[in-house]
Amino acid sequence: MARYTNSLKIFTGNSNPKLASEIAEHLGLKLADSEVGTFSDGEISVRIGESVRGASVFVIQSTCAPVNNNLMELLIMIDAFKRASAAEINAVIPYYGYARQDRKAKARDPITAKLVADLITAAGAHRVVTMDLHAPQIQGYFNIPVDHLLGGPILAKYFMDKELGDDVVVVSPDHGSVTRARYFAEKLNAPLAIIDKRRPKANVAEVMNIIGDVKGKKAILVDDLIDTAGTLVQAAEALLDHGAVEIYACATHGVLSGPAIERLKESPIKEVVITDTIPLPEEKKIDKIKVRSVAPLFAEAILRIHEGMSVSKLFT
């Protein structure tokens, strides 16, 4: 450890200091000295409390709620490191906000995921490290290296250790999550089912068609994030209607906004497994929700980046 402690520095904003502290601990380091607050008029204030000249800096900041505050904190911290002559500035963004605004879905829509990528690059970041982007092509929005970590192995291990038996089916809640769910199914040596959502005509409720056999099986819904949980709960109810006997759900990012917690409480889902890319506040902690840590994976990725080693080897 001693060979890199002087040149490797881990900083955090206010979005997920607990995760940042755990990552630093796995590296045998303490969080570097910084203070991120606000001035009386609401502007963000950043103070870097130690020299970063010539250092390899990793700033850990998810752009989760409050999204705009956390994004501005990240940008201002990157700018501060650049002006303080850091040798390399790595933006570690476990959850990349605005990722769902990745294309023009209708006329005159912005592509905000690209705008955010441009802002991070313009601020002075040399590299981005993130996890399970909602749209993997966002990696191409950057003109700097992007290391895209996968949460699937962490979530799959939870269910492998749980030993649910042979009657398991992995379910993709929509077409967009099929690749993620297929990886999960291969890990668990289980079949794959897909939910095909169709709206027969305008002003008519969506119909959920299930492609694959779920009758008599324990179903595991796999997605990248859970936001309001509306679609997830509808999918769980559709699976029960088609004969599934138990429903589990997992996602890398627990956004859990609006009515999500109440919906999950009242839903037929037995367990919801997420990671700690986004902190789970006390008021959202319920027995159904199980949280797995991504700190060891991010720590290993940071070490590999710092040492000039392959990051992709973590998944091969």
UniProtKB/Swiss-Prot annotation:
Organism taxonomic ancestry: Bacteria, Bacillati, Bacillota, Clostridia, Thermoanaerobacterales
Gene Ontology, cellular component aspect: cytoplasm; ribose phosphate diphosphokinase complex
GO BP terms, alphabetized: 5-phosphoribose 1-diphosphate biosynthetic process; purine nucleotide biosynthetic process; ribonucleoside monophosphate biosynthetic process
Organism (species): Caldanaerobacter subterraneus subsp. tengcongensis (strain DSM 15242 / JCM 11007 / NBRC 100824 / MB4) (Thermoanaerobacter tengcongensis)
Coiled coil residues, start to end: none
Annotated Mg(2+) 2 binding sites: D174
Catalysis: reaction(s): D-ribose 5-phosphate + ATP = 5-phospho-alpha-D-ribose 1-diphosphate + AMP + H(+)
Subunit record text: Homohexamer.
A Pfam family hit: Pribosyltran_N
Annotated positions binding D-ribose 5-phosphate: R199, D223, D227, T228, A229, G230, T231
Active-site residues, record numbering mapped to chain: K197
UniProt entry tagged with the keyword Nucleotide-binding: yes
Matches recorded under PROSITE patterns: PRPP_SYNTHASE (PS00114)
Protein name as annotated: Ribose-phosphate pyrophosphokinase
Pathway: Metabolic intermediate biosynthesis; 5-phospho-alpha-D-ribose 1-diphosphate biosynthesis; 5-phospho-alpha-D-ribose 1-diphosphate from D-ribose 5-phosphate (route I): step 1/1
HAMAP family according to UniProt: RibP_PPkinase_B
